[in-house]
């Protein structure tokens, strides 16, 4: 429902209109769609989700997100997390009470502090990031990052240096296998995008 609602809005836009503000609007529309469904049918009262949306305009990556789904960029063998999780354990990290490495093992690791479809008033984080040539963009759910840490993600990407479409499919498969081998029970969702500048 969330993806359908956001997608219907974004599909009506021209590529150049996929700005931070419109990505944010798509998530707000998804939020309202879930709230409306809950009002119509009690069986959906517990419905809620995390959400991340991204677009590339020129060499700029625009993004909007709520929850603990993540956006990463890989370039020059460096993996950078662009988004900040809206979660209880991330708040503990920010307060210096636990390390990032401890997040996956904390008993309250699955508690998110912000979600789509819970309250009418929703704060959506947005931002943009300049992509370098040959950057790799990874969007993923906590089904991936809750099971394997950034070092494993970094290692898997480094072991798949080529970036053809078939290579990206293999990288997708390898990352999913790592998560399921680590015991993933949740859905593991991820999207990989290779950015290559078009030279005039």
PLM feature segments, named:
Residues 1-200:
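PP2C/PPM-type serine/threonine phosphatase catalytic domain
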């Amino acid at each position: 429902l969330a993806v359908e609602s956001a997608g219907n809005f974004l599909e009506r836009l021209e590529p150049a209109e996929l700005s931070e503000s419109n990505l944010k609007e798509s998530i707000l529309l998804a939020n309202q769609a879930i709230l409306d469904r809950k009002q119509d049918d009690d069986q959906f009262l517990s419905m809620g989700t995390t959400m991340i949306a991204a677009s590339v305009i020129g060499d700029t990556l625009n993004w909007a997100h709520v929850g603990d789904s993540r956006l990463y960029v890989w370039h020059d063998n460096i993996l950078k997390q662009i988004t900040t999780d809206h979660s209880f354990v991330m708040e503990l990290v920010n307060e210096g009470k636990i390390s990032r490495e401890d997040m996956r093992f904390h008993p309250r690791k699955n508690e998110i502090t912000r979600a789509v479809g819970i309250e009418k008033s929703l704060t959506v984080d947005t931002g943009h990031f300049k992509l370098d040539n040959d950057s790799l963009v990874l969007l993923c759910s906590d089904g991936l990052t809750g099971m394997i840490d950034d070092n494993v993600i970094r290692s898997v990407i480094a072991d798949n240096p080529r970036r053809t479409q078939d290579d990206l499919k293999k990288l997708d498969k390898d990352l999913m296998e790592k998560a399921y081998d680590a015991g993933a029970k949740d859905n593991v969702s991820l999207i990989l995008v290779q950015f290559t500048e078009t030279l005039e």
